[in-house]
Amino acid sequence: MSTSASIQATKVTFPNQLTSMAGILFVPPNMDKTKKYSALAVAHPFGGVKEQTAGTYARKMAEKGYVTLAFDASHQGESGGYPRDTENPAERMEDIRCAVDYLTTLSIVEEGRIGLLGVCAGGSYVMAVAPTEMRAKAIASVSLWDLRVTAREGWPAPQYNRTSVLVEIGEQRTAEARGLTVRRDDGIPKKVPEGAPEIIKESYDYYRTPRAQHHTSRSVFVFTDFARLMDFNYYAGIEDIAPRPILFIIGTEAATIFMSKAGYEKAAQPKEWFEIPGATHHRLYDDEAAVGKAVAKLEEFFGRSL
């Protein structure tokens, strides 16, 4: 792949059981191959891919001296797995474990200094896997999105009936078991509905326009996966991450701020809360000023934690 500002970005693959995972490995400028570096596995948002905001953070943290790995989730992007577009929390968590596996095989990585970083839903997955992934020595999220809230409450949609959705999921599973094509719904609308909440407009602008649109980011999901997402609670065991440190980074204007607060309040010390004034959920994806502040905090956090 291309290089930028002395950053070497290389496409790599690594296994998750029988699934081939696709990633981009970023290494620091002027890397000394005789040395070992701290490393980060970077998980992407729901509907996203490694070339978007996860790759942005991976590249910027490599510029700060880290070996970083941004990777596509199983069933998504350039990673393998069928059916395509599945969003399975258990598999997303296993993807992260396998990314750590891969990092431990690299001669340039100090295996005792590996951290996890997740953006949006990726933030919830790194927090969820960390209690039982002891190789992760420090964990951070940026603009965390709790998909359980969306699946159970329909947030940010104003009208939603969970029971009706579950009945529909059951009917769809029965139909698919009898041979019907797998149903996929838009995770990001192809057109912004009239009167849509601002965060939906932000999502559309990021994923569906030249701002960050990528041909491997389909921004759809398997409809029946909503049942799995309803069962997923990212902070169920979050207090067990301690004494390893965790960090939540969120914009003061992010509609999702309450999702990070729920995890932060349940987590044990050492934990940190870092707000970026004026930033919305998606400004922390690619806005240079907002991302710059987030990266500066991440550099400080991982610098003393790994």
What are these regions (language model features)?
Residues 60-80:
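Conserved alpha/beta-hydrolase
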Residues 127-209:
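Alpha/beta-hydrolase-fold enzymes
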Residues 241-242, 248-250:
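Short beta-strand/loop motif that positions the catalytic acidic residue
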